[in-house]
Amino acid sequence: MPQKMCANRQQNQIAAGVPCGRATGARDILVSNLRLVRWLRPAPAGGSRGSNMTVAADTIQAVEAVFTGRLAAGTAPGSSWAVFDRGGVVAAGGSGDAELGGVGGASAGPETLFRIASCTKSFTAAALLLLRDRGLLDLDRPARSFVPEFSPEVPGGFDVAPTLHMLMTMSGGLPTDDPWADREESMTREAFRALLTAGVRCTSVPGTAFEYSNLGYAVLGQVVERVAGMAFTEFVSREFIEPLGLDMHFERPGDEGAAVATGYRRADGEGWRALPFTGPGVFSAIGGLFASARSLAEWAGWLAAAWAGDERGPLGSASRREMQQLMRVAAKRPSAAPANGTPAPPVEPAAVLPLVSGYGFGLFVEHDERFGPIASHSGGYPGFSAHMRWHTASGLGVVALENATYAKVSQGAEQALRLVLAAAERRSPVTPAPVPWPETVEASVALSRLVVDWSDATASAVLATNVPLDVPFEERRSAIEAAWLDVGGRTAESATPVDARCDSPNHLVWFLPGVSGRLRVEVRMTPLAAPRAQTFTVKVDGSAASGA
């Protein structure tokens, strides 16, 4: 049944904050705080973090089944996961073994510490933004302004020095280096200085292309140290981990009571082989943190809360939103097959490639065709796999950790978040629709009357000065009359708009019924405080436009 729109109804909806084309009951995804199950969260301190999302018990069971299914398929000895929103952890769980065999064997749970590897890069980026916001550095300055020994060789003889911004967005021209860099965490400052002095190479001109570089983030870690005057690990702990109350560490906790997962790799014919831990060093900035699923979800939820204007914590919401903006587009590459005979993890059959993906500051950003922007990061270290991802519009997210090399837990996290978002969307759209300005609605009512009964005076009162310059009023009136003839003429309902929709507060599209068809009308307002219609088009639904 067509949706009728009138000025009073539209303006009443606008006053109530209702998106264009939606009923008043669908404004919020959820209206209560159902909190699961075995792990409950306290109310957030220091103010609201935006709407808390309810995730039903059957959805959480489906999420848990994703990760238990992965373990049954042999992807890792153990796993831990959490579902979160802007208010914190909604539900969390774990299964399998954090440590295999022996007296110290233990089960994995949401408090178990795993290496989160490259998820640490979000802390490195946040540290640089914090220093920038304090006026201590400029992201557009060359990195060698802070680390003089970093002067990479650029192909083609171009005289371009990678800036902090380029390195932060994975466009510094440096080559992908995961296997090598993952083994260099403990490198000393002296060894790193010697490495850079000996020279490094770029594979592309800095600032021109995406290529994921750990070396670039190790350089950024040194920038933090030299500007802040303290070790990178100390700065991140002091400025972020401690103020936010996160259970995270750059060294394996020495407390015997601490639950720490052991990392494993699958050895041919030998099953799982335990791998040694590495200690902090220069490459801690690329992936050095230990974190639990709960604490990583708290961090991700705090980043997600920036979209609700949450100003708690050390970094302002504007800078946290900046981290989650796509700044460098990346080509979607096929995933490599797991090595050493590790079974391929189950993949959601309905998985959809993003429309576009790339890198922000310490985070990947992708645009999902169904749900819109998703922020994420994966982490892979010898013996560990980590992933965090969230839907920026709703704040719903998933964290997942496994203790095996090449486990690719990102696949499970992607599937789990789609389950959570799909369940939420069955109750109400998870991506809010834009709400038209009152002036946009008023213009649509006046222009609907104008289309039925043209008046130059009415047109002059509603339309911006460019409109008659683009197409004169007389030409517009004639084109509109021709359009009415194409749909069999006017009816008593022709001045009543139906099926209104918008893509921005200054925009509306609606339809006016005729005898045998309908006209499509579109308006887009100017950006002024007292806006007028700068775009006004009328056409037969399905035909070419008759105005501009």
Where in this protein do the model-derived segments appear?
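Short, conserved catalytic-motif segment at the N-terminal edge
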Residues: T54-I116, L136-D138, E149-E153, R189, ...
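Short active-site loop at a secondary-structure junction
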Residues: G69-A82, G102-L167, T203-L215, S284-G287, ...
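Short, surface-exposed loop or secondary-structure junction motifs
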Residues: G88, A98-E99, P155-A375, G380
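Short, gly/Ser/Thr-rich active-site loops of penicillin-recognizing serine hydrolases
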Residues: P334-A336, G372, V399-E475, A544-A548
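Short, well-ordered beta-strand elements
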Residues: H387-W390, S394-A404, R520-R524, A533-V540
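Short solvent-exposed beta->alpha transition segments
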Residues: A457-D503
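Exposed beta-sheet edge and beta->alpha loop/turn motif
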Residues: T496-A548
